[in-house]
Amino acid sequence: MTVFDEFNEIKRKGLPQILVIFGESRELVGELKNQLLTEVNFEPTDLSQAYYDLTPSNSDLALEDLESLPFFSDSRLVILENLVNLTTAKKSVLDEKQLKRFENFLDDPPETTQLVLILYGKLDSRLKVVKKLKAKAALLEAQELKSQELIQYFSRISPLPKAVLSLIAAKSNDNFSVMKQNIDLVQTYALGREVTLDDVEKVVPKSLQDNIFALTDLIFKGKIDEARDLV
């Protein structure tokens, strides 16, 4: 089960009071963030929702939003991105007093408040506040997808045949963001018609694996000059 499968299950059941999206793959965390914002119909002008990309200058305001009761609705959603104090990165956006306020929120979160944390990196499990967070929150860790998982994921959201997706995955070195870009590339090239394997070969740049295979083949055939040109 991929992190996207886990997220679909969470959406089916309804978002928990506290959700943490984290991982070392910025691309996958970013994709989950976009899906979350779509799921909750996020609107910056909606007073029942708040989003903060945390910095030392806005952290007090973010904590006040988190601690406040909703005024214009029955519930409030607060999304905090880049609360780096919770990760293994040696950085911080909250000072000690602010971090204690956040910890106090975790001790007794108001029923009317939903919190989503979006973090790039690993959680620092040694920290007391992270231990509390893990006990209270649903965790979604964005881990790199394997080749077949990539193909399966994009086959759900793309009309491209699996054979085409398999070739794109190979040419993308099984990288999520590169594969996403290459899918857009071949669809733009095809101008609405069905994408073929030939389209992929023509449009998608050769992967490192492709180049190594071609280089090895040229060397075995004694075509040294062509091999040098390839490099």
Task: Give a label for each model feature.
Residues M179, E226-R228:
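Solenoid-repeat scaffolds in large eukaryotic assemblies
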Residues M1-L37:
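Glycine-rich P-loop/Walker A and Walker A-like loops and their local beta1-loop-alpha1 context
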Residues T2-F4, G30-D217:
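Non-catalytic interfacial helical region
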